[in-house]
Structures are given as structure tokens and as C-alpha cells.
Amino acid sequence: MSICVNFNEVTMHNSKLLLFTLVLIYWTQPLLADPRAGWGLGFGGGSLEPINASSGTSYHTSSVYGGTLDYQWPLGKSFSALITYAEHVGKGELPNNTKYKSYKTTLLGAELRAWMGSFFVGVHGGQYYLAWVESLSSYSGIVSAGGNGYGLGFETKSGWMFSAYHEQSSTFTSSEFPDQKVEGNRLVLGYRWP
């Protein structure tokens, strides 16, 4: 058994994380926000797609639509934390396996947000799930992998919110399909109840 590590990817990922952390530290000095606590529900779409982990080939053939449910609580006036559940569906085709025409991705995770007025910048991580769907009663086994993402957005005092996220999962391995990842962007429009 051998273990391969691509140090270029690890170094690039760590440098992005370090840069993002430094920007957050700089921005948190003048933050005056008071994030809302409560449940949030959002709907949206984007380009969140399964791709071949080796070649980068995309398997999706349509836009992706979905929803998000979260609970947010303030961590002082400058930060908030969320527990989030997001689910998205789209059409797609796998090579050498034509019975599946759609896929479903799910994220169950936690997010930390830094606030400046009504605007926020957030980072999150969690467990990503992927299933290929033939019909409502027939789908592939559900595979899972860790992953992370980042986003930005705003929430109004009346509760309306808009956010944009970039997502990237680790590799899903399955005996049915080639190794895959879920990557892409998603936009969310929603409402948070006090």
C-alpha cells in the first residue's frame, strides 16, 4: 500500500486558507454588526457539479437547483456560527452507465461568518454526499466525503438574505463509478426568522 500526496495542492490550499484568515483578522477590527439568530431557509441554483477526480471531466448536463436550511447564532457582534444543510439536484450523465440521468448532492456542515454591517464573509466545512438517480425509487448508493467552501453575502434587518458560495469536496470513491468530486458555485436567496 502506498500513499501519494500532491504537495503542490496542499501548499496552494494552505496558502489560500492563510490568506483568507489574515483578511478576516484585518476586517474584524472595525466590525460593528450584530448578526441575527434563528432559522434560515433559502433556495437557489448554480454550477455545483460532479466531476471526474482524475481527469476533471464534468458529468452534469443542466443547471443545478436546490435549497438550504440553517440555524445561526451570534458569537458576539462580529462573528456568527451556523449549522447548515444544503441539497441540490441536477441532470447528468456518466460514461458507460446510461441508466442514471440525474444526481443529488448534499452538504451537512458548519460555517463561521465574520460580519461588517449587513455583509458577511464565511468559511465552512462538513460532509458532502453524492447519489446518482434513475427515478424517485431507484438510485445509486450514497457516497460521502469531507469538503469545504467559502462564501459571501448579506442579510437585511427584515430577514432577507442573499449569498454566493464556492464548494469543493474531497474524492468520492465507489465500486459503481469512477472516483468523483463535487465542485462549483451556488447562489442562495432566502429568509431568516428571528
Predicted features by range, described:
Residues 49-59, 92-101, 131-144, 172-180:
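Outer-membrane beta-barrel translocator domains and adjoining extracellular loop/strand segments
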Residues 91, 144-194:
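Predominantly the C-terminal beta-signal and adjacent terminal strand-loop region
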Residues 29, 68-77, 109, 113-118, ...:
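Outer-membrane beta-barrel proteins
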Residues 39, 77-83, 118-121, 158-164:
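Repeated loop/turn-to-beta-strand initiation elements of outer-membrane beta-barrel proteins
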Residues 31-91, 95, 127-129, 184-194:
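Short glycine/proline- and aromatic-enriched beta-strand/turn motifs that initiate or cap beta-hairpins
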Residues 37, 59-67, 89, 102-108, ...:
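Residues that define the transmembrane beta-barrel architecture of outer-membrane proteins
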Residues 1-36:
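Cleavable N-terminal export/targeting peptides
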Residues 120-136:
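Membrane-proximal helix-loop-helix units in multi-pass membrane proteins
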